[in-house]
Amino acid sequence: MLAFLVIFGIIFYMNESKGKLHPVTQITNDMVRIFGDMGFSVAMGPEMETEWNNFDALNVPGDHPARDMQDTFWIKTDGKPIIDELGHSLRPVMRTHTSPVQIRYMQEFINSGKNLEDETIAIIAPGKVFRNEATDATHEAQFHQIEGLVVGKNITMGDLKGTLLEFFKRFIGPDAEIRLRPSFFPFVEPGLEVDVKVGDRFIEMLGAGLVHPNVLENAGIDSTQYSGFAFGMGIDRLVILKTGISDVRYLYQGDLRINQF
């Protein structure tokens, strides 16, 4: 049904049929709802980050290949170092993951006077991230991730496994299975790759682990008293899993045929 609106004597015809959410938005909303039901709150952060929040505070070594120009979109400056009063590099970078939200949230939590003895941090952080890499059917220069962080007293690997298993049971179905494999990420120790069983095979789905003590200390949290776990997964990958879209680039081409999903 068509309706019309008259503005300054000009008639604008409008289709009253409702629009449709993009598949990435649909899946993000589903994940936020599920994690919300599990007790997580949503935290957000800027897409343009500092070198400190994106790398240094997350225990990423100075010579780590992720910092190379061919992997990261660094923002041009006048070439002079940008350092704060604590000696942290404020060199701007388009964030390469949603993990910087961990640092920002933990610092704000401590600075606000909150106490981990009384309250456990449990957040998710969905958002867009950027990688300076060639695009193909499974890679894009921009994509979406969701970060999870829990910090408190006596947080264990069992808590991590139970949280992820419960999420996938709600997201995929009650028969969902996960498999944990040892891996390495500088911001967690130990680190894990998490595979999810889809049909008769396991698919690599996300990275996770217990928050590295250095990361907790960099955020102002005593790592001898508190522990935590973190995980990060690609939302686009879950969109492909749910919809069967064969090429991640289809999600960002503005093609209205994507509305079929």
Set out the residue ranges of the language-model regions.
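TRNA-recognition modules of translation machinery and tRNA-sensing kinases, especially anticodon-binding
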Residues: Y13-F261
